[in-house]
Amino acid sequence: MKANHIRILLLVTIAIMFISLMGKWEQTFPADNTKQQTSATQNNSHYDNADSSTNTDVTTTDAKSSLAKETNFSKYDNAKSITINTGVFKDVKVSLLDGAIISASLKDYSISLDDKTPMSLLTDKSGSEYIAKSTIVVNKQPISVNFEDQGIKTENGKQILTLTGSADGLQITRTYTFDDTKYNISVSQNIKNTTSAPVNVIVDDSFARDFDPAGDSFSLLNAHSYTFTGVAYSTAKDSFRKESFKDISKTNGQPTVINSDGQGWVAFLQHYFVSAWIPQSTNAKIYYKNLNGDVFEAGAFTGATIAPNQSENISSILYTGPIIKANLVDLAPNLEKTLDYGMLSFFSEIIFWVMNHIHSLVGNWGLAIILVTCLIKLIFYPLSAKSYRSMAKMRMLQPRIKRLQETYKDDRQALGKKMMELYKEEKVNPLSGCLPMLIQIPIFISLYWVLLESVELRQAPFIFWIHDLSMKDPYFVLPVLMGLSMFLQQKLSPAPADPMQAKVMMFLPVIFTFLFASFPSGLVLYWLTNNLISISQQWIITRHYQATHKK
């Protein structure tokens, strides 16, 4: 390691390899789910013993169970629906056919920079359906309930939609409570048994989504392919687990059921956004499954026995919106873990906390990245200064090193010995400059995940042509400037003794310009800023060292 650019090569190579491995690991092994499987009978439903606590923690049931019935999205095409708008939601459609929420758009999040239409997180659009539904189940069979609209009333800034319906001797009153400023919806069911016998009832809150896992492919040079799409869930025993749609599609339609053990939630995760059902009962069970290739379902169901002429209240919270920690932390234990920064989340959360506070002052995420970089360089300045002084000393030793190379050009063993003697005599450690660079690896990786996973940086502009710091530079200006800064660093650093190595080093700026061209522009901005500060520090320290150590 005789030059700063070699250390940069080490840093970025390790970081890129680590990021790639983590991304591939997340997709290949999203969760270490050790399942206890039971031998299900041919028509065994996963609704069996729904109110019992004696089931195994995880059960895989038969694909021919009642749960595995396909979701018929087309039935909503001509059904009547109620539309609600809030401060954060646009056109929330609740179908009167069964009370499913078949559409919900997010006012503060547009589809793209070019299309300012609010993105539809839940949608009944053909081919990409994604709905949230609450199904009433009697004797392990879903019943069909056609609801009637009882109107919307406003209380304390909240809109409350009430639907009523009846089927199989049950009278059902369902209410949806919308807070004007929040993405969570309270869904409450009052179920009255009008028959003369007890009835075993299940309320199944679930999501159904049409999604092609084959299109969710991994690419080394596509930063956004490292993100996760699939199911996430939490129980009292298991704080956070994930299963990708790709892995679930390999289960041959077999549903998987998990005891919540008193608390839990289940969610569909995608880049930046999450939809989660949070049951409020203590005996809920969580499940997920693949229905017919491209349709996936996940939910939480709660069972109860209702005596004749008695009622039962069962409620849940539905969250469908951006993955923002402040929105999630109070809704349910561990729901904030859907903001997954990976194995270095501790550092990522600190970096985001600092960036967020700086952003609140300057109002620009690009400036926040630059100022965070300056802060990081300030914190690590003592180590960096030591590294640059070491390189300055190595640079002053270059004439003596070249003389040794000429003298012992035919005896590499003797050359190595003389070089070590020279380093010892001058108290120089050629590896001393590596430590500051190695310490930056977790910072580099942590910032990468902050830029990739934080919805706050989605479509966040910087200046001029940079309109989205979470995406690559559309004109590759920042990667080119970053490459030029690397080239300038080479000129300030001691040249490699090996001519072949020197030629290879000449191409490093080009190689890394190509690699960084596909990275989020915010990350390239960080690295460019880091390089420019490093160049300034190195130039000042080198000149000062040379001025004070002239012989």
Curated annotation (Swiss-Prot):
Protein localization: Cell inner membrane
Gene Ontology MF terms in the entry: membrane insertase activity
Subunit note: Interacts with the Sec translocase complex via SecD. Specifically interacts with transmembrane segments of nascent integral membrane proteins during membrane integration.
Regions that span the bilayer: 3-23, 361-381, 431-451, 504-524
Entry-linked InterPro entries: Membr_insert_YidC, Membr_insert_YidC_N, YidC/ALB3/OXA1/COX18, YidC/Oxa/ALB_C, YidC_ALB_C, YidC_periplasmic_sf
Signal peptide range: none
Main location per the UniProt record: membrane
Membrane topology: Multi-pass membrane protein
Cellular component, GO annotation: plasma membrane
Source organism of the structure: Francisella tularensis subsp. novicida (strain U112)
Annotated stretches, region: Disordered: 33-58
Family membership noted in the UniProt record: Belongs to the OXA1/ALB3/YidC family. Type 1 subfamily.
A Pfam family: YidC_periplas
UniProt keyword list: Cell inner membrane, Cell membrane, Chaperone, Membrane, Protein transport, Transmembrane, Transmembrane helix, Transport
Compositional bias segments (type: Polar residues): 33-47
Function statement: Required for the insertion and/or proper folding and/or complex formation of integral membrane proteins into the membrane. Involved in integration of membrane proteins that insert both dependently and independently of the Sec translocase complex, as well as at least some lipoproteins. Aids folding of multispanning membrane proteins.
Protein name: Membrane protein insertase YidC
CDD domains for the chain: 5TM_YidC_Alb3, EcYidC-like_peri
Domain of life: Bacteria
A Gene Ontology BP annotation from the UniProt entry: protein insertion into membrane
PANTHER family hit by this protein: CYTOCHROME C OXIDASE ASSEMBLY PROTEIN COX18, MITOCHONDRIAL, OXA1
